Amino acid sequence: MPLLYVVLTAVTVQRAAFGVTTAARDAARAYATAGSDSSGEQRAETAAQLAMSDQSVSWSPDGRVVKCGDCSYAGGTSFDVVVHARIRLPLVPRWLCGTRCLAGITVSAHHRERLDCFAGTGAVAPTC
């Protein structure tokens, strides 16, 4: 029985890890193709939400998903996407967790994306 619990926990954590990794990558790609910072942030959140729900992981953003310096959305600039998810361990009742589950594991993913030199508002970064 303990071995079964270990396997169940490993599968749950792996599913969440795959979900946050995919969410970070998809959010970065959605932001990069948006055309502006405001619509990019919305698209990034939607893409991350979709990727997480595909893996059956509940998620809601805690602040901005896309981390960038001045978010100028100029070609050649790079930005980071960080996604965190707290998953509940298997067989732990929801009522025991409350709003912040102590019987859980936090899984994180980071993805860095660079805007194409000809993307964005027409301004090109000196690095292009």
Q: Can you name each region flagged by the protein language model?
A:
Residues 33-128:
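Short, conserved structural patches
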